[in-house]
Amino acid sequence: MTKNLKLFTVGNFEFRLQHLLIIAVLSLAFSVSMLIRSQGADYGFELNEFDPFFNYRATEFIVDNGVDAYFEWHDDRSWYPYGRNVSETSQVMLHVTTASLYKIFGMGSDLYDFTIMFPVVFGSLSVIVIFALVRVFAGTTAGLFSAMFFAVSLPIILRGGLGWFKSEPLGIFFVLLGLYLFFSGIKYNKGSISFAKIISGALFVVFALSAWGGTQFFIVPLGLFFLALPFLRNDHKFIIWAIPLFSFTLILLTLIFERPSTSFVLGYGGVAIILPTVFLIICCLIKKISSVEKQLRNSVIFLGASVLGGIALISSGFIPLPTFRYQNAVNPFLLSENALTDSVSEHVTTTLETSFQFLSVFLIFAAIGIWFIFNNFRNNTQNKEKFITNDMLVFVLLTAIFGVYASSAFIRLELFASISVIILSSIGLSILIKHLFNNTQNNARNNSVKSLIKISSIFVIICLLTIPLVLPQDTNWVDYAKYPATILNGGSSYNVVHGDWPHALNWMKSNTPSDSVVFSWWDYGYWITAIGDRITLADNATLIDHQIEKIAHVFLKNEDDAWLQLTKPNPAQLIGHELRTNTETGLDEWKLVLDPNGRMGYGPEITEEMIIETGIDADYVLIFLAGMRITDSNSPPYYILEGGGDESKKSWFIRIAGYDEDKFLQSDVHTPKSAFWNTMLGKMIPFTIVGYGDPTNDKIYNDYQFGLVPVYTPDVKYPGNGDGPFRLVYVSPSIDRTEKGPITAVIIYEINKDYKKLN
């Protein structure tokens, strides 16, 4: 055939036309992925979201100080006054890999710019890796389809676009590469080649675990695959050493890393690998010593006993429970009683509408893929033609089932559903085309009918695949991935570029003492530390719950009580007691700080309440507001808030602090009551309500009614030259706009240490 036409020879390798076609398709997929992921550059070349700023700062530390210093780094600029052990609480491989590659490929470029492009490059390189993986499963055609689908998949692009210097792009690259090496190693027994691939596969999976915690969601289907393997393959002499080799290497290498280390080995991840591996070894031995007639029966009995034993281990509590987010992934109906967990936007439960928007027509081809896989399984049992071996078939199905199931818990887990559906849909589409062409060749009565069927089918498939890329307008997959970096609009609901945050952080860095402690909501901690170079109390790592709860409490106190707590020294700082972030241990150590003589004998709940009331020793308070000016320059300035800043997050402040929302908010859970305006946060908002507007007719009313929107006018309560507890020292530019349009205002107050309360 033409595709096998030999073009030239390199050594023993014959380069044929089909190889050129593969390179062309992969190059196209890589280029398309790069272009879609880079659309954010139209708004500005910045890191996106929050975590990437910490990752940039950690990478910069390695570049400047070396890897050894990184593993000894206790960051005293965050989580004041406790600090943070960076290597124990971070994605180590992300930082080490980026720093290493920067030294090789940086070529004098700025590290900040290098980290902005890093996720785009590795996210696009993953199209090649998923091609290789799916090719092992179901052939070259399926692999090429998977590469093209991966290049345009919305959930994958959203978590790997320009500036998304987080763990997912590198983690996905590593885990897909590790799985490819593992499955290509066990597909056939090739001796030393299989040995090398299995070892390398385990190594890259460990890299993925260290770079991205989400890799653990790939471990569960892998463990289930190990359980099924003795029933799927007859080459027990091979798998009895190949699988333990992978598992042993994985566990051993995991222990070398500070994270995940023993927490993975002794937790559900390690159990999901170790116990199925032990089962596989014993099951293979049982089959070896059993007669042919009793092999299946004895193996099934042992499987049942193993499952019951596993349930008993879990029920006994011998295996520690994972964190809530992993439990919630296994049980999507599990409700969180932690307001802090619920407040994270990435923890929003996935809706059917979101799933269909993210997966779109891929679901159609994934369903076709499932049908063909089950049909293939039937063919295997009947010794008919098959396109995928039983063991690969089972892993594909396990990954798909677990991926789609887990994605129903959190919206961020749509990433796993997307990868699962991509694999299934690429397999389904490749087999569909193969059967379609074969059937038309065998059944068509004449060439014209053949051609019509082929052309019509290809046209329909192309139209289906094109729909999510072009429809609907402005919210299709291509346009949806085009948005400004979070720091350019503050994470507000407005698709604008104001630059208020970069301006504010540069002002902070230039106009405040280097040892200043900035009190703010935890969302902004990474920005303040990395760009503003100032000390913060909390950030997106959410390491210490009671620290964030304390921040919420202070925001909702009256100005005098808030000022007093903000200016008081922190007892942990005075005593020099190193407190851990582990809740139980941390509370026990705090009891020694708060009650060194053990006279009070209070329990954990009272201890936590007392921690929340301890001093903070801050110097500045930062708040962020987002809203809309609704009048032009010829009219008095009126505003509507609720644009995604602290004015919108106040309901979460209240819940996290444990207060009653009815005390501070109206029935719509947004509009403030008078009690809110007496809090520190309320008084720091430089606006006052002048009435309540009806969006349907633009009328203004004096009293609140449900459905009305508060209308604000400027009103600064803490002027810069005042003698109150706080002094306004900075307001970002957009708040001064004179025309209609959005504002994304960063406001900074200096804490007046000389303030005298009025009795």
Kindly label every feature range from the protein language model.
Residues 1-39, 50, 144, 282-308, ...:
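Start-transfer (signal-anchor) and selected internal transmembrane alpha helices
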Residues 3-8, 27, 47, 52, ...:
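Extracytoplasmic
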Residues 14-52, 57, 64-70, 74, ...:
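Transmembrane signal-anchor helices characteristic of membrane glycosylation enzymes that use polyprenol
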Residues 27-33, 70-77, 118-136, 141-189, ...:
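Membrane-embedded helix bundles of polyisoprenyl
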Residues 80, 84-96, 105-128, 161-165, ...:
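Loop-to-helix entry region of an early transmembrane alpha helix in multi-pass inner-membrane enzymes
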Residues 191-192, 235-241, 292-300, 364-397:
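Membrane-interface helix-loop-helix junctions at transmembrane boundaries of multi-pass membrane enzymes
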Residues 269-285, 299-378, 392-393:
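Alpha-helical transmembrane segments at the extracellular/periplasmic loop-to-helix junctions
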Residues 363, 397, 402, 407-441, ...:
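Hydrophobic/aromatic-rich transmembrane helices and adjacent perimembrane loops
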